[in-house]
Amino acid sequence: MAPTLYDFHHLPHVKTQNESKKALWVTLLLTMFFTAVEIIGGLISNSLALLSDSAHM
């Protein structure tokens, strides 16, 4: 019998999914942090540019 060219592995994707969820949460928390910083900075400095930029995040 001839050897096959493809070797299929059906491994569970739990580790990959957990890593992806962790990366998603870190990204979400960083975005929320910078949004809050821009809102506070915009209110303190009366900067409409910072406030509008924070609203677009």
From Swiss-Prot:
Signal peptide: none annotated. Its main location: membrane. Keywords: Cell membrane, Membrane, Transmembrane, Transmembrane helix. Gene3D superfamilies: Cation efflux protein transmembrane domain. The chain crosses the membrane at residues 24-44. GO terms for cellular component: plasma membrane. The keyword Chloroplast does not apply. To cation A.eutrophus efflux system protein CzcD. This is Uncharacterized protein in glgB 5'region.
